[in-house]
A protein has these predicted regions:
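Structural microenvironment flanking redox-active thiols in thiol-disulfide oxidoreductases
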Residues: 272-311, 324-329
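Thiol/disulfide oxidoreductase modules built on the thioredoxin-like
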Residues: 313, 323-368
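Short active-site neighborhood of thiol/selenol oxidoreductases, capturing the structured segment around
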Residues: 249-278, 291
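N-terminal "domain-start" segment that seeds a small globular fold
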Residues: 219-252, 315, 362-370
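A non-transmembrane, solvent-exposed segment enriched in polar/low-complexity residues
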Residues: 21-168
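Bacterial Sec-dependent N-terminal signal peptides
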Residues: 1-32, 371
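N-terminal targeting signals for export/organelle localization
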Residues: 154-233
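Generic structural signal for well-ordered beta-strand positions
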Residues: 66, 249-252, 351
């Protein structure tokens, strides 16, 4: 089974590596964003799945800025222009952070800070390497699946992709275990080790220091492990609500049907391909009792609008434009790389997690054959 992820996996860590703060300690972030002649620059943190503005200023012609905010434990903060998605993420602790960037390449900003920021930069370098390799293999899969492609190579490239995915997960686990005193470790574990519950999650939690596990990220990691344990295949699906135009949608809305819930990200080709393939599965199985409830997490207005127009999704889609997670992501422990879906059976039992649209169709075929 091909687990579709890739470039978004790197973007996701900049969006899903979350933060909160309180107390009397403060930090300052200053620097220059070349080419940023006007507009409001915001310093943000995450709170309850939403970005919260902490400080702001109107950028001058020289592109220089200085912002500050309170901080307790070392945590992730963001810089964003106007209403756009956060463009720069950094790990802040008491002291000073310096940023040197260009408006056209904010993802390559040079950021200097404390030891946690240095560790974050080191880790993200490895993640970009993994993402590049996975994207290249994914393109090979697409070319092989083309009309004039070498179909015999699809299985080979798929196996390569899955092998690389397993290597990445093991790398993340080893990285977290090797840095038991880092506040970054539980954040990385809950962001990347998101394929369902594994005893490896408990191993990491035991290895991390009491101070780290008692922090915001440590507590979030404990909650993530609990949710992962409670959403294993064969268990009853947890209840949740997604609201669109004042109408709440939950598993109860689709009682008696096979429900596939999926979180995805607009503006990413692998996510778009996944949703396009899912649409074909829906059209095949909808009359036989399949319902789909999808939720796009984050993403810009223009990208989302274009994707929704081109995809023309026939089911209920609930956008979470300003968030980094929602009830669906939280309840099923679907943090990290998207898309991610869960199949809930007619009786409310979880039948599958992280399956491709092709595998979803196979599962539905099996259920039809053996339940009739």
């Amino acid at each position: 089974m091909l687990r579709i992820s890739g470039k978004f996996c790197v973007a996701a860590v900049c969006v899903l590596l979350v933060a909160g703060c309180s107390g009397g300690k403060t930090f300052k972030v200053k620097g220059t964003i070349k080419g940023a002649k006007n507009g409001v620059l915001y310093l943000q943190k995450e709170e309850d799945g939403r970005y919260v503005n902490l400080d702001s200023l109107e950028m001058g012609k020289n592109g220089q800025f200085e912002l500050s905010a309170p901080v307790e434990d070392p945590q992730m903060y963001y810089l964003a222009f106007g209403k756009a998605e956060p463009a720069v993420s950094f790990f802040a602790e008491k002291g000073e952070i310096t940023v040197d960037a260009h408006i056209d390449s904010l993802d390559r900003a040079k950021i200097k800070g404390g030891k946690e920021q240095e560790l974050y930069v080191e880790f993200m370098g490895y993640m970009r390497d993994f993402a590049t390799k996975k994207n290249n293999i994914y393109l090979d899969i697409l070319r092989s699946n083309a009309v004039d492609g070498d179909k015999d190579s699809v299985a080979v490239y798929t196996a390569m992709y899955e092998s690389l995915d397993r290597r990445q997960l093991q790398f993340v686990a080893n990285f977290a275990i090797s840095h038991p005193d880092s506040y970054l470790s539980p954040l990385l574990a809950s962001t990347f080790l998101n394929k369902g519950y594994s005893p490896l999650l408990d191993t990491i939690a035991v290895k991390l220091s009491p101070e780290v596990m008692g922090s915001r990220y440590g507590k979030d990691f404990s909650g993530f492990i609990s949710n992962a344990k409670n959403t294993l295949v064969g268990m009853e699906a947890p209840d949740f609500e997604l609201v669109k135009d004042s109408v709440a949608y939950s598993p109860k809305t689709f009682a008696g049907k096979n429900l596939f819930v999926v979180a995805w990200a607009s503006g990413n080709q692998q996510n778009i391909d996944y949703m396009s393939a899912l649409k074909q599965v829906y059209e095949k199985w909808h009359d036989k009792g399949l319902e789909v409830l999808s939720s796009s997490i984050g993403g810009g207005d223009e990208e989302y609008g274009y994707d929704i127009y081109s995809l023309n999704l026939p089911w209920t889609e609930v956008r979470d434009a300003r968030g980094i997670k929602n009830a669906l992501v939280d309840k099923f422990a679907l943090t990290g790389a998207l898309p991610a879906g869960v199949l809930i059976g007619r009786d409310g039992t979880i039948l599958a997690r992280y399956i491709s649209p092709d595998d979803l169709s196979k599962v539905l075929g099996y259920l039809e054959k053996h339940n009739n």
